[in-house]
């Protein structure tokens, strides 16, 4: 499972001009689900997202988590994060889980983050979306449940 985590002052997702998810201060997280992901990857990602310390404390040091600051999370499924461009010029998405298999994993990730006490909004699975991301910093972190960057 792969995630691009962006610290934001606000985030919003629109589908066909209608807002389907919106948050204030927190994270916009783009999530790619890999063919070989398991329940362990979901648990790992949920824990990392909720406890990632990238919000500033009173001394200006990145030391606080989403839970510490009462932040929200906008989770957006994005299979293109699994794209492989090492060969040729067109990305290959063979490492992405098929949509009908990925949806339950995405929903389980949403559920696990909510269980940890974070307000979660989402985009619309498999829809063309317009994603508004008002970066704060900017702070952007890459997380992969299987790889180090």
From Swiss-Prot:
Keywords annotated in UniProt: Cytoplasm, Hydrolase, RNA-binding, tRNA-binding
Subcellular location(s) of the protein: Cytoplasm
GO molecular function: D-tyrosyl-tRNA(Tyr) deacylase activity; Gly-tRNA(Ala) deacylase activity; Ser(Gly)-tRNA(Ala) hydrolase activity; tRNA binding
Motif placement: Gly-cisPro motif, important for rejection of L-amino acids: 137-138
Main location: cytoplasm
Gene Ontology annotations of biological process type: D-amino acid catabolic process
Enzyme Commission number: 3.1.1.96
Reaction(s) catalysed (UniProt annotation): glycyl-tRNA(Ala) + H2O = tRNA(Ala) + glycine + H(+); a D-aminoacyl-tRNA + H2O = a tRNA + a D-alpha-amino acid + H(+)
Pfam families reported in the protein's UniProt record: Tyr_Deacylase
Domain notes: A Gly-cisPro motif from one monomer fits into the active site of the other monomer to allow specific chiral rejection of L-amino acids.
Record function comment: An aminoacyl-tRNA editing enzyme that deacylates mischarged D-aminoacyl-tRNAs. Also deacylates mischarged glycyl-tRNA(Ala), protecting cells against glycine mischarging by AlaRS. Acts via tRNA-based rather than protein-based catalysis; rejects L-amino acids rather than detecting D-amino acids in the active site. By recycling D-aminoacyl-tRNA to D-amino acids and free tRNA molecules, this enzyme counteracts the toxicity associated with the formation of D-aminoacyl-tRNA entities in vivo and helps enforce protein L-homochirality.
Matches recorded under NCBIfam families: D-aminoacyl-tRNA deacylase
PANTHER family per UniProt: D-AMINOACYL-TRNA DEACYLASE 1, D-TYROSYL-TRNA TYR DEACYLASE
Family: Belongs to the DTD family.
Protein name: D-aminoacyl-tRNA deacylase
Lineage: Bacteria, Bacillati, Bacillota, Clostridia, Thermoanaerobacterales
């Amino acid at each position: 499972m792969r995630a691009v985590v962006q610290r934001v002052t606000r985030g919003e997702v629109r589908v066909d001009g209608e807002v389907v998810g919106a948050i204030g201060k927190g994270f916009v997280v783009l999530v790619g689900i890999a063919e070989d992901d398991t329940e362990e990857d979901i648990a790992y990602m949920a824990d990392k997202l909720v406890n990632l310390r990238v919000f500033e404390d009173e001394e200006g040091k990145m030391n606080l988590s989403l839970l510490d600051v009462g932040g929200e999370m906008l989770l957006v499924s994005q299979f293109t994060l699994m794209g492989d461009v090492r060969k040729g010029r067109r990305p290959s998405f063979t490492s992405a889980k098929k949509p009908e298999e990925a949806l339950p994993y995405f929903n389980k990730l949403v559920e696990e983050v909510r269980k940890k006490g974070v307000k979660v909004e989402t985009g619309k699975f498999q829809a063309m979306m317009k994603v508004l991301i008002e970066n704060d910093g900017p702070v952007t972190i890459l997380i992969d449940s299987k790889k180090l960057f």
